[in-house]
């Protein structure tokens, strides 16, 4: 970033320290980039961009993946930059609720059509109210009409962790964690960026090699007692920012969704036509009709996330 901006000066070093402190980055500066959580990676990319001291700053959905505190800090920082440094800022936002106070003008893009320029005040006064529900009655009934899989969902203890600790080098990510999920429960896992949420989910999804050294039960079976990773994954539908970053496959969307039936990144077994029908069903549920043959790499990032959501739902998993 310093090379992009020019000379490394004392002033830029002070700016660097200010950004580190503002985003609470000191604790992960020595981590490899590949080990950063989605929120930490977002902070890292924002910091790198800000160190370069650009004249025009274009940010695509900068608040996605940030915890509430960091969202507030980023808004304050951008407000400061726009006023004190005369930085030109263009934000691409999917949600009108994310429009920060310092924005002066808005252009709405809808159905591939670019609207007229409006002041923020005029836009907020005339915008259409947000939909309370985007799932139609017909789609909801179609989901409820799917065949029940109660006989396949017979685990009483879906997840149980007993005094689980995860350590990388000198860094302790989780320590003496106890957590039990019973059949029928629905959990929200909440925490700041870097708190260990992604690491915790990697244990549940059998993606963390340290899980074999931990006391973990998944779907009534203790880890390391003969089950394979695929025996576990067949029960789980999973989507995350980390998965989105790694799933860069130039494949038709319907094959991306179908890979969820095979628990693979990519598709190496030809699905049956009935399985393709399942894929089309979930693409339709998420409003993605007509894109089944389009390349995943040619979709917007938002459309890609919806395709990966359909992939997570397609096998009607015991744990989502």
Q: Can you name each region flagged by the protein language model?
A:
Residues 1-35, 241-298:
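ABC-family P-loop ATPase nucleotide-binding domains
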Residues 46, 309:
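Hydrophobic anchor residue at the start of the ABC signature
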Residues 57-61, 320:
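Catalytic Walker B motif of ABC-type/P-loop ATPase nucleotide-binding domains
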Residues 111-142:
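Conserved beta-strand-loop-alpha-helix hinge in the C-terminal portion
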Residues 159, 173-176, 292:
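Conserved structural motif at the start of ABC-family nucleotide-binding domains
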Residues 190-192:
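The feature captures the beta-strand-to-loop junction immediately N-terminal to the Walker
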Residues 215-231:
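ABC ATPase NBD Q-loop/coupling interface
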